[in-house]
Amino acid sequence: MYTSGTTGHPKGAMINHQMQLYNVINLASPAFVSTDTVQLVVLPLFHTGGMNCYANPVLHAGGELILIRDFDPGLALSILGNPEFQVSHFFAVPAPYQFMMNHPDFDSTDLSSLKVAGVGGAPCAEAILRTWSDRGVSMIQGWGMTETSPGGIGLPAEDAERKLGSAGKPLLHTEVKVVDDEGQELPWGEVGELYIRGPNITPGYWNNEEATQNSFEGDWLKTGDAARFD
């Protein structure tokens, strides 16, 4: 899957079956995915979020997907609120949540069937989290990359308001650390570059050995993202 990541230049991150399997395992438990899951998918399946984060875990569990060709906030709300569909799961980047909460049908939409809502791909504004929380929907926040297939870090819904702005903790089978410019691990509270490793990490970039070499320190993927432990 091609991604520009933090460099701005698209690179083909190689995605193998092991990565996808461990991504399913890593996400299934915190997202409460089961055979009863009905998930509305609004991201395109050529995107790692649409395919690997949102669709594959549900397919693996034997749940049900509802796909829409183009995102429309009114249509998405009508599906979420339709008792015939009983949508239990919805995941998206922050923008769709904002478009839906600004839609005139938002306040009147019945969201009682929605048990799990997830957001990632970009920092989520506090106003979005609080607006949806006021409707009884607490969001699972997370961090990931195409290179991490994409699940890497997750914040449980019960901590959404207590830890506003946090990406959470490493998911199953992943390990993270924060390092300085010399690659030395930093103490808690100091900002540095996030490194991550695990069986869900890409082996490298397609036909781009230079990018692969520059992106790894041993088996640690250098994400290029700033982070700190609290």
Where is each model-derived feature located?
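Phosphate-coordination loops involved in phosphoryl transfer and adenosine-cofactor binding
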Residues: 35-36, 113-114, 218
